[in-house]
Amino acid sequence: MASGVQVADEVCRIFYDMKVRKCSTPEEIKKRKKAVIFCLSADKKCIVVEEGKEILVGDVGATITDPFKHFVGMLPEKDCRYALYDASFETKESRKEELMFFLWAPEQAPLKSKMIYASSKDAIKKKFPGIKHEYQANGPEDLNRTCIAEKLGGSLIVAFEGSPV
């Protein structure tokens, strides 16, 4: 079901910047986004970047000790959101970083909001080619490390964001 909602150019630019890892200086790496939250504009016609709802790679270890916990804390309790999260995890063989796309639709969100976000999900996903991991979370219990590790590769995952699972 299409909603007719558009996706802002800035959303596409942020996705591209997060997906493409070009050789960068240490300062440029610190400015790269670790997580970004997107919301609907006030008129509900466009998906935009939510002001102030991002984590920069340079914040991790400096002002943010647990980036995933901080990311979960940025999600509203009673409304829906989309998000991109640059997940760092380890398998038994190697260390990996992959983008995850989230639809956050908590139980307490208004029904109309859930319907608009669900019906607009395809519009934003089409702007994010190559996303390997898509996840819908309906409450904080869906966003624990075990659930995310399962989504990323199940028993092959030994650590997520530096913490054992």
Swiss-Prot record:
GO biological process per UniProt: actin filament depolymerization; actin filament fragmentation; cell motility; positive regulation of actin filament depolymerization
Residue span of motif Nuclear localization signal: 30-34
Keywords on record: Acetylation, Actin-binding, Phosphoprotein, Ubl conjugation
Modified residues (Phosphoserine): 3
Modified residues (N6-acetyllysine): 19
GO molecular function, one term: actin filament binding
SUPFAM superfamilies attached to this UniProt entry: Actin depolymerizing proteins
GO cellular component: cortical actin cytoskeleton; cytoplasm; glutamatergic synapse; postsynapse; presynapse
Sites of N-acetylalanine modification: 2
Domain of life: Eukaryota
SMART domains xref list: ADF
Tissue distribution of the protein: Widely expressed. Not found in skeletal muscle.
Acetylation listed as a keyword: yes
Modifications after synthesis and translation: ISGylated.
Domain ADF-H: 4-153
UniProt family annotation: Belongs to the actin-binding proteins ADF family.
Role summary: Actin-depolymerizing protein. Severs actin filaments (F-actin) and binds to actin monomers (G-actin). Acts in a pH-independent manner.
Name the UniProt record assigns to this protein: Destrin
Species of the source: Mus musculus
